[in-house]
């Protein structure tokens, strides 16, 4: 495997340091064994998320100085609008403060209580907004996506037979829309093939069902298509992205990932009537339709960053840096979700902590142990993130119980990946020392963000 060097020079740095293990243990205890509740100053290498943790370019910083902070009609909005229309091909764009702002708008605009939303695996905030507006989420991702050890391409594809069965059983009129994520975060950052997007479009169009993409990591998805799908090897990333969205009616976007910024998002659609309603609704929750809760400078940085993300050298390095970490861990026998996706390496906590049951929260405990032993912050993505069934109150029990090592864009080097790998490999050699956890505080909504735990 060829791992390309960073396609950038570092112009500004932030000093970080490793606090002693006994202090890390104390900090973890104070945080209730929830890595979300740690203070960033106590983190050596922060792999909690790739959301808003990107390093911006010199051109983006220059653009920040060109912020038009007019309350309405900001020139930066029009720059962002033109950029998204050109690259994605959608007719309308509504800016939001981040991705979940767009999820909130779409859910209110598109869902009637009692309808179904089908998608290729749930995501935490996305499903929350869908259910909050009365929908029932139905997972129609291919079965292979739930098998952590299965190494095949495009595990994020929608199972067309599952989709057809849902249409036959529930009726097309009772399906609000299809939520197609590119890539599928909780499956390990798995991509969706262009062939599958095209097939989903053909099937839904025949039944009058709309398709909205979660476009958060669309550039990473495009890279996998270029790398692995026949007929796209000679196409540019921008060309692939544009074709991807030609099979959708709109999308939600968290600009904090593939737009290479620290804040921002947007909702896209082609339907004029929906756009009119979205402009009315965004004023209530975000702000004027020309800023959506964002400063002008942030919209400018997002427009510039989205173009930078289309550069092949950037996205090749981005994906292969993640793959480098995964390959090191796999070579040492550490169980991971395969194949390695575009934004993170997912540790398979079921196999890593095989001495713990799912009710002992192995992924949560593993994430806490990783911080204590290595100074690296990661994130639980298992039963805690899945939450509870709204009707029964029982835990959702995902087949995948993982810890996500999420790599921020343009922030860390291969040397940092070596440090992460070495620390986790060492921890794996003493995995039986990892103890199970129990709730001492469980929030009712999106519990993984603020829950607290203690050892059983």
Curated annotation (Swiss-Prot):
Alphabetical list of Pfam families matching this protein: Beta_elim_lyase (PF01212)
PROSITE patterns from the UniProt entry: BETA_ELIM_LYASE (PS00853)
Catalytic activity line of the entry: L-tyrosine + H2O = phenol + pyruvate + NH4(+)
Gene3D superfamilies noted in UniProt: Aspartate Aminotransferase, domain 1, Type I PLP-dependent aspartate aminotransferase-like (Major domain)
Family according to the record: Belongs to the beta-eliminating lyase family.
EC number(s) on file: 4.1.99.2
Entry cofactors: pyridoxal 5'-phosphate
Keywords: Lyase, Pyridoxal phosphate
GO molecular function per UniProt: tyrosine phenol-lyase activity
Subunit structure as annotated in this protein's UniProt entry: Homotetramer.
Protein name stated in the entry: Tyrosine phenol-lyase
Superkingdom of origin organism: Bacteria
PANTHER family to which the protein is assigned, alphabetical: BETA-ELIMINATING LYASE-LIKE PROTEIN-RELATED (PTHR32325), TRYPTOPHANASE (PTHR32325:SF4)
Modified residues annotated as N6-(pyridoxal phosphate)lysine in this record: 257
Biological process, per Gene Ontology: tyrosine metabolic process
